[in-house]
């Protein structure tokens, strides 16, 4: 289905020959070398794995079904399939997480040599099981989370990962192109239920309901035109996230 979807997009939309085409996957679903090779032949050239932690106990605590052994297996499969651009997502501030567990996770992920690493502070989203359990869990306090973040910044830099945005680190030449489009406030188009776009001076999002989306009619759940003040404010806020900062001109 993914290969068919990509072929359809290529037919309908102009796609640059050197486009970065990322597939996001859970580690437990990215261990099939044959399937990964088919995806690479179809045009996918970057894999992003939702690793989150190298500690199996923490993974269970946040409801993840993969283990770190499966992460290692997935990395081996991704490399065997020929992918040269691999990203991994990590989360700090997990319930019960210690500094030692975070240090071990950073070390374990560096040992797998991905080209890109994202480190996100835990965000409790309403409607999720972890949000519902928030009062019964013990989370690292703000100071502990700050220490975890600064540790990642320091150690990743020591291992050749350049920080180009608050949460993102990459080997030279491997900064995520689609991430940079957001931070630089460039246009992007989203497809699918709930997808957001910022295109032609208008921002819009499709409805989340699948049946409504596939009805074939253009249904927007929200839309707003550009406002100079809003754009200026967002430029400042987004630029402050990047290593480049604000252009004072």
Residue ranges and their predicted role:
Residues 1-249:
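C-terminal scaffold of the Radical SAM
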């Amino acid at each position: 289905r993914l290969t068919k979807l990509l072929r359809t997009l290529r037919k309908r939309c102009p796609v640059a020959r050197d486009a970065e085409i990322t597939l996001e996957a859970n580690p437990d679903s990215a261990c099939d070398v044959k399937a990964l090779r088919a995806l690479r032949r179809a045009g996918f050239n970057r894999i992003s794995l939702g690793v989150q932690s190298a500690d199996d106990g923490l993974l269970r605590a946040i409801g993840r079904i993969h283990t770190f052994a499966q992460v290692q297996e997935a990395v081996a499969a991704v490399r065997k399939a020929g992918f040269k651009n691999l990203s991994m997502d990590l989360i700090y501030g997990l319930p019960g997480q210690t500094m030692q567990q975070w240090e071990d996770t950073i070390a374990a992920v560096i040992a797998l040599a991905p080209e890109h690493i994202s480190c996100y502070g835990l965000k409790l989203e309403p409607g999720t099981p972890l949000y519902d359990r928030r009062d019964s869990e013990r989370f690292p306090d703000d100071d502990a989370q700050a220490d975890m973040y600064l540790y990642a910044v320091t150690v990743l830099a020591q291992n050749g990962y350049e920080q180009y945005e608050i949460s993102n680190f990459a080997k030279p030449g491997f900064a995520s192109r689609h991430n940079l489009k957001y931070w630089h406030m460039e246009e992007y188009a989203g497809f699918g239920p709930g997808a957001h776009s910022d295109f032609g001076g208008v921002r819009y999002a499709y409805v989340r309901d699948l049946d409504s989306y596939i009805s074939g009619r253009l249904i927007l759940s929200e839309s707003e035109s550009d406002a100079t003040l809003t754009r200026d404010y967002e430029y400042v806020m987004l630029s402050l996230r990047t290593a480049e900062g604000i252009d004072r001109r």
